Amino acid sequence: ENGLFVPLCAAFFAIAAAPAAGCVISYYISAGQEDYRRMKGETLRSGETGIPMGKALLILFAVSVVGISAILRANFYYMDDSPRAALGYKQWDYFSRYLSTALATLVHGGDYLVDAAPLPQMLAMLIMAVSGILMGYIFCERTTFSGWELAVLSILGLNPYFLGCVSFRFDAPYMAFSVLAAVVPLLYRNRNTAAYLLVSGLGILAVCTSYQAAAGIFPMLVVALALRMWNRGESIREVGLFCLKSAAGYALGLLFFKLVIMIPADTNYVGNALPSAGELIPHFLENLRSYYSLILSDFKPFWRIAAVLAAAAFCVRTVLDSRRRTLPAIAMTAVALILMGMMCFGLYPALASTVFAPRAMYGFGVLLTVFGMTAAEGKTRVPLKIPAVVLSWVFFVFSFTYGNALSVQKDYTDFRTRLVISDLQEVEAFRSDAPVTVQLSGSLGKEPVLWNMPQNYQMLNRLIPDTFGGGDDLTQYGFYCYYDLQNVVWNPDVDLREMDLPVLEDNMYHTIRGEGRYVLVELK
């Protein structure tokens, strides 16, 4: 009876809260529709022409899907895609990503995650397209868009760091949803304080329970909007009140997540603990420096030039359009630029053990989108639009390069895996039905042809994961689970590298050592 008490109480409160939740949702839907009708009327009265929001969404989604078509064609199992497809597990709860777990049940039609690719990845690009259109709607305050604006909005979903997210066959929609959850609260920034605080808190809570790497997007967009408000001539009090309400809603969501929902997590690559108070700021700045060092090495020279010019165009456009005096406008733009640059990676730089993988850095893609969206706004000052549009084009092209590289890596992995299996068949231990412990050592690395792409290699090197080797469960699932190896046993409790096993086979691709019921494969 005691075991049923908590679930029954939870069910009771969920049922009791349903009417209130319905009223809240109904209010926000009605408020959003009312604001849209008002904005559409203002757009018509202003004489602004362009692509309507609905058509703009379809265009942006189509461009995004075409952009990732090479990734979809590669049919690549990215990192933990292999074990998820083999075992159907979720396990996002370990990182307190309960919303991802719940949404995955809906997307995959049950608790067991079936491989439904490319549906999740296409859903992710639809969510990113919606996020981009909403960002344009929020910043430009109109319901039509120009071709320039749509071009730069494609950066949001096709920047190299988000490509590392959409590569996941299972995780992609929830990574994209974290961006949408950070954008939606800003639709209600002009509503009453209570409504804005609540939706901001809920939005940040949704970010933290889907993918925490997006935790810096909301405050970054708040800073960009505050700068626009100030440049339009709105009073310091109005701008300050907007920032204060946004900060309060953000803190509300973070505190609730930290105190009520979050569970401590610590893996071999990331944890959610913070350093001591005295070390927090130096640690944050050091990690921030590491993130930007990675960006400098990831981006080839032409990308870096285009990104810097896009940032410069953002600054110039902001100052030229400002109703304030030039020097204060320059100063405020510089402050906003620094703040956004510090916020775009969210809370990750503050973690004692953080992650520097490309998938954790897509906030920088949002920052580039903000730069481009500001520079491309309107029909004037065409030269300022060019850097961001060029950046959107090179990212579009790179998405095909990356997808093709995944395909090449997959073929190389299959080739090397089949060679190992073929040679194992000749080992005497496999001539009976008795189980044999087989371990992998070393790694095949990247496909040799990728080394011939010096301009793209560093970005590709970080985006393309290890696919076959020892020491990491994610690089071994394919070998142990996908080839129906009848009498092969995966036993991580014993380390065959410590045994002096005799060489049974040695060739240019691998060395096979073995004795009795133990076999070690050393990949070269």
Features from the language model and the residues they span:
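Start-transfer (signal-anchor) and selected internal transmembrane alpha helices
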Residues: 5-66
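Signature aromatic-anchored transmembrane alpha helix within multi-pass, membrane-resident enzymes
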Residues: 195, 377-400
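Membrane-helix interface segments
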Residues: 116-118, 143-149, 192-198, 235, ...
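Alpha-helical transmembrane segments of multi-pass membrane proteins
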Residues: 126-129, 176-187, 200, 217, ...
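Transmembrane catalytic cores of multi-pass membrane glycosyltransferases
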Residues: 1, 5-6, 12, 16-19, ...
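Intrinsically disordered, polar/acidic, low-complexity terminal segments
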Residues: 43-94, 98, 104, 108-131, ...
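Membrane-interface transmembrane helices that cradle and orient dolichyl/undecaprenyl
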Residues: 182-197, 229-234
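Membrane-embedded helix bundles of polyisoprenyl
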Residues: 147-166, 173-183, 200-204
